[in-house]
Amino acid sequence: MDSSKPLWSSQPFKALYTSYFLVKTPVHLLLLSVAYTVKPLRPQPAWSVKENVRAAMARMLFSFWSSIRSQRPVYTAPEKAQERHARVEPPPAAFFPGAVAPSDLVKPAAVDAIWFPSPPSSDSAELAKQKVILHFPGGAFVLAFSHESSGRPIADALSKHFQADRVVWAQYRLSGTPETCFPAAVQDAVTFYHYIVSLGVDPANIIVSGDSAGGNVAVALARYLQDSQTKLPLPRGVAVFSPWVHVTKTAGQDYDQEDRSQADVLHSSVLQWGADVYRPQGQLSPETEAYISPLHHPFEMSVPLYVQAGSAEGMHDQIRSFSEEMASVRGNRVLFRSTPLTPHNLPFCHDQFGKAKELGESLDEAFEFLRPDN
């Protein structure tokens, strides 16, 4: 529940704050552009002036969206995808046991799958051979971005480097009400995965991926598939990029205390907002806590897990610790990659920070690691 809503999230204060932001921000960025010509003044000295300014602008935007509680700042309705859009109903209740079970408030719901580059084949024999990536996008559980301007470049990169036929852009429900807190996003992940399997796609040809909060959802789906007694098969593997693994009651404060956080693209306010509305109210069971915040809650995985983090991101050390904990579980196959001088969420930020080469290398490495014969 969003009990800490800022004053600026309601009219007329939202309009006033928006006007102030639109006037102030260009001036602020101009002043930073001048200040950052002096290398010691740059938050990240190894980055160029332009890269530091872009990171500052991202922090300002995240802070602004958090202040006015704007959940779809750059959004494209799923219906705009036309024939690539599929409205998917959730599977029967038996597929939602334990921590993801329906409650009086949080229940499985229909989801919108967006296919790239085109809808799946109707030929069952052909579909069985299709290689499909199920990708969960980031957004701190509270922000959704356009499946075109944001989703298409990510889908194109995944298709190319993972040698996949199709990518499903899987936007789960955003949190913000008691009906959309955990386990809503994981229930949606189960619905997406069940949908792809029910089409006839061979699970050995499915890779689950996610970035930032979407990486958290991908890890939660892996935990569910490993632990639940449902008959959903395991995918080939899981690849996550800058996964948000430490979703605590004090997420914003935790982030600010991390090295590199003040230079990265994220702002602590968006993480605190996300944690406030994603985490259910009251005392959580150990099982629920493990799903929400997987750091310090490693689990057995029968499929390989690839984890990437940027060495310049505020979440780097948390993600590395999560990877080490997962790798310590007997039988787990985990590969962690720290990408040099890279901010949070390489798939999302690679173009703005000139990291296309690094993204390609990371995806190629992930693909090789997740190969069945590896």
Regions found by a protein language model. Give the residues of each.
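Alpha/beta hydrolase fold serine-hydrolase catalytic domain that processes acyl esters and thioesters
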Residues: 6, 17, 187, 200-205, ...
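Short hydrophobic segments within beta-strands
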Residues: 116, 135-139, 209, 241, ...
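A glycine/proline-hinged amphipathic helix-loop "lid/cap" segment
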Residues: 1-127
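Alpha/beta-hydrolase active-site loop signature
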Residues: 140, 172-176, 245, 343
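Short, surface-exposed "cap/lid" segments of acyl-processing enzymes
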Residues: 112, 117-161
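General small-molecule cofactor/ligand-binding pocket signal
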Residues: 114, 168, 335-339
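Catalytic nucleophile-loop/oxyanion-hole region of alpha/beta-hydrolase
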Residues: 151, 165-205, 355
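Gly/Ala-rich beta-loop-alpha elbow adjacent to hydrolase catalytic centers
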Residues: 210, 214, 218
